[in-house]
């Protein structure tokens, strides 16, 4: 899976974290592992321009998604497996997201992770124009975000256990479980 991030926002953003959450969601949604995604982080003026040009709405917004290939999560069990494709582009506006994060009482990193999940779901055809669509998309968005956080916690626990095990093995004279 190829995920490229271009930070043109002028803000210091953790690109590996954005890649991590995007990769997690793409995998959970059964998208072909060779799919490609592009993420661009822009300033408010650039986002406002995109928002007017593509949505005919004034001012900046938090996230916009531009799908490339028609993809659906999962797919029918009797259909041939889809090949790799270009999911599309997600455009994030960190400065706009920072204001939203402040209002919501959480970190910018959390807000950008949430918006990344949101953007990927839009690329996969989810929408929230109608109440039922919104309920489905936001429920899935929140579930995927929580699963990603749980996955990060699991990885941290495993790393801590591995480090502890190495220390214990070192004290006993065993290294990597091999008797010297």
Swiss-Prot record:
Binds 1 zinc ion. Its cofactor is Zn(2+). Zn(2+) binds at residues 118, 122, 128. Signal peptide: none annotated. SUPFAM superfamilies: Metalloproteases ('zincins'), catalytic domain (SSF55486). Keywords: Cytoplasm, Endonuclease, Hydrolase, Metal-binding, Nuclease, Ribosome biogenesis, rRNA processing, Zinc. It is found in: Cytoplasm. GO terms for cellular component: cytoplasm. Its EC number is 3.1.-.-. InterPro entries: MetalPrtase_cat_dom_sf_prd, YbeY, YbeY_CS. One of its GO terms (molecular function) is metalloendopeptidase activity. Single strand-specific metallo-endoribonuclease involved in late-stage 70S ribosome quality control and in maturation of the 3' terminus of the 16S rRNA. Belongs to the endoribonuclease YbeY family. This is Endoribonuclease YbeY. The gene is ybeY.
């Amino acid at each position: 899976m190829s995920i490229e991030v271009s930070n043109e926002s002028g803000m210091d953003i953790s690109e590996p974290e954005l890649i991590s959450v995007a990769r997690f969601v793409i995998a959970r949604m059964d998208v072909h592992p060779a799919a490609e995604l592009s993420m661009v982080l822009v300033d408010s003026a650039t986002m406002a321009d995109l928002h007017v040009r593509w949505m005919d709405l004034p001012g900046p917004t938090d996230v916009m998604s531009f799908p490339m290939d028609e993809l659906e999560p999962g797919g029918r069990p009797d259909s041939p497996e889809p090949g790799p494709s270009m999911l599309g582009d997600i455009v994030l506006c960190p400065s706009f997201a920072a204001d939203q994060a402040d209002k919501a009482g959480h970190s910018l990193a959390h807000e950008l992770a949430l918006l990344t999940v949101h953007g990927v779901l839009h690329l996969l055809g989810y929408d929230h124009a109608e109440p039922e669509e919104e309920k489905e998309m936001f429920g899935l968005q929140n579930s995927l975000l929580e699963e990603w956080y749980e996955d990060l916690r699991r990885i941290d626990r495993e790393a801590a256990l591995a480090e502890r095990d190495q220390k214990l093995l070192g004290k006993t004279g065993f290294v990597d479980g091999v008797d010297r």
